[in-house]
């Protein structure tokens, strides 16, 4: 059984998801696209207990929670508001901040909106997702200010985080991207990111920084470009430079800056939205499906940074 269809307009979204019961049915179909199977006995038929978000097996009576074991685990927020939050995150061009989400959903507390967005960001990375491939640009920069290739600058970051970008080359444009925070610009850090983000055998373009030299021994067709400076630096790796420019504009414009602790999860969102920029309504469906594949996130975990790829 394929995944359920997704709404193709705001009008359809409002018509489809006007009640918590409708949202629950869609969540069931998204979480079990091949049909429900009882975790205890394997039976494929169940009663819906909509008021408690449960499915009760018709054979053994086991009650399976639709939201247990997902990012929606033990939520007290109505499913309709979760669906609206996922819709706004996936389809709103500039994204949405916690302050904006609080206003849009008429939430009493800012913290509720913040937690919802953080949980959705953690659901944006598919477990065991594919690595990008083909011809790829790779570059690194300090978030908050591109150092334009100054080697001295690469060693000094202050409060800035070092982010590495890998961008597929598609004609004159960009394909998929991957972003990650690294501790430093050593070969171990940079090559480690590439190995997690780019498939071996790919053609990898970088600047002339020595940290990228080991890529060739790792099975990549590494083609370093002559290091530039000043106004010529963006021309070396234009797609990666454009990705960094868009990332920093988004972080400052929508979120007014992001601290290092939570930056990896904002990178998750940027990558998710960028890679689905041509199909935003389908991205909503994808996000709901991914939300059902992730383990619960505790409030304490929301304050712990985790690596992205």
Describe the predicted segments one by one.
Residues 1-309:
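Residue-level recognition of single "structural anchor" positions
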